[in-house]
Amino acid sequence: EKADGSSYICIDREWKDGDKVEVFLPMKMRLETLQGEDDFVAIMRGPILMGASVGTDNLDGLVADDGRWGHIASGKLVPLSETPVLIGSKEEVTNYLNGLKPMEGQTLRYKLSGIFNDAKFDGLVLEPFSRIHDCRYMMYWLCMTADGYAAYTKRTQEEEKRLMALDARTLDA
């Protein structure tokens, strides 16, 4: 018997030793939009937040410690223009993600390619965020059409340069 996803199933029967109930929970990929930021999405597979490691460069200051304010990452910021952006409508990106097959012999790991703003990001591995440690990572992704991305890039490059320069000369004492 199938439930509609918002209800439950009653099993009314007399149980015998060895009886089993098998429950299949289809877990499709879906995008969850960040509240107030329509162009940023989290990738979910069922209840699991998915992410990708994007490198281990410039990690100085990014490991938390138990000191005062130790939970705040203070390493070098990376401009948004140097991060992977998912290119396509949300529907197209969702369809792409649901067409992925897990990497051979690996659970919940998917190789991504042909979906980014720059081919240099092809080969990133999407996996449960809980498995990602000691690296820079993507958990919230900018997702927009190619035309939307071109307009966004033009609009934000100058502002980002200004903010990065301000961050470089700001001292947090």
Predicted regions and their residues:
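Short S/T/G- and acidic-enriched coil/turn segments that sit immediately N-terminal to beta-strands
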Residues: 7-8
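C-terminal beta-rich recognition modules with glycine/proline-rich loops and embedded aromatic residues
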Residues: 2-4, 13, 20-171
